[in-house]
Amino acid sequence: MVISRSNYRNICSYTFFMVNLFILILSVINEGFCEIAYVIISVSSVLFCVIIICLERQGGFLNPMTFCIISVFFFILIRPVFFSQNITENLNEVITAGLEIDEIYVFYSLAVVNIPLAFTVLLYSVQKGTVSKLVGQLPDLFFYNKQLSMILLWGGLFSAIFLIKSYKKFIILGQVSVFEADAYGLYDELFWFTLSKYCYILSLLFSKNKNFILYSLLIFITSIGYILVGLRGYTIAYGFLLLFFLDIRYRLKIKWLLLVAILVTTISSLFLNYRIGIEVNSGLLGIIFNPLLQQGASFETVYGALKYNEKILSCISYYDYFFTNKDIGSCIDIARGVYFKEGGSFASSFYSELIYLGWIIGSVALLLFAFSLAFVQSCYEKIIKNSMNNKLAYTYRLIIFLALPNLIYFARSSLFDFITKVLFIALFIGGLSIVRHIALNIKKCH
């Protein structure tokens, strides 16, 4: 009997889910078991991530499911997992700020991330077949209008403005540090990036040359402005978008991907020193590993949401969360005593908001997220299947082009960020299909 890839994925996810749940229950009953349990679930986290990435590898390692796992691991899990063998001695490395660091809640936080992660993959597996059939029914959106492709020039102009203004902020950042970002308006010019990105998207839609590598490169170059003002996560997300389309065309080897990863972490380390205003890394290993561990800062928001849940609920109600602009990230920071009023806050994260909203709303959110992930992954599989027909795969490439940066960054963003992005893309695709149908009818009439 041959076991399919999906069955392996289900077995792996179910085992990971049950191991974490069982160990969590034992630890609640007997807190003395926590230190050993912490090591066990840390090892299981690494194994689970590696196995899922290997199981989902079809055309290459770079695919939506891989990016989902990478997002959780590097934005959430890497720090608690890295220090798992000596957690008691390294508590201040895992939770760097706050009123009182509780080792037991650090363990609980890790388990509370692992369990929804396994549940997400299970939900993804359940929906994958249906979603794949749905994706196969998407309309062909390939059309162009040469005159509208001139908007590419406007995109280039906005990119230049954004990079110039970001460089000026970069000079200021070297003098004041990121913890004074709001006071000096370091993030006031980010809208120029949004303008340039939308111009590139419109140009991609209506120009004859639908080169996704070219447009990914243009957006990535523009996103360098983010890293200049200390927001390196966005630059990394758009860098991975470029790598994805390069991998689709050239099938990048793992050694080149590792080389790019080392290069990115080294550059991030140098920018981090400049951003904070002090030397935080020493030696080659410090330059490579410390930026990775610093990316795991979103684990602190998970810890805060779990340990100080009642304080956060008193700070921001569900009504405020859904219907006002009140920031849950600030409430998490305030609850654990690390609020930076002029910038540099820990903000929020996918899993901290999952904890805040509770398991009923959270389960619905995970169901929707798994559906969205299956939708984007199915588009990737259609691209691989139709790799020799660029026109046939255009719609699927377009969807991934629009959705992938949000997926790469999802673990650090809000709970509904990726879900709403996929919803808007679906509405956009529907509207674009209508526009194309009308345009073709007009062309036939003439």
Swiss-Prot record:
Pathway: Bacterial outer membrane biogenesis; LPS O-antigen biosynthesis. It is a multi-pass membrane protein. GO terms for biological process: lipopolysaccharide biosynthetic process. One of its GO terms (molecular function) is transferase activity. It is found in: Cell inner membrane. It comes from the Bacteria. It is an enzyme of class 2 (transferase). Keywords: Cell inner membrane, Cell membrane, Lipopolysaccharide biosynthesis, Membrane, Transferase, Transmembrane, Transmembrane helix. Its EC number is 2.4.99.27. The chain crosses the membrane at residues 11-31, 33-53, 58-78, 104-124, 147-167, 186-206, 211-231, 252-272, 355-375, 391-411, 415-435. GO terms for cellular component: plasma membrane. The keyword Repeat does not apply. It catalyses: n lipid-linked O-antigen repeat units = a lipid-linked O antigen + (n-1) polyisoprenyl diphosphate. Polymerase involved in the biosynthesis of the lipopolysaccharide (LPS). Catalyzes the polymerization of the O-antigen repeat units on the periplasmic face of the inner membrane, leading to the formation of the lipid-linked O-antigen molecule. In vitro, shows a preference for bacteria-based, undecaprenyl-containing substrates rather than eukaryote-based, dolichol-containing substrates. This is O-antigen polymerase. It comes from Escherichia coli. The gene is wzy.
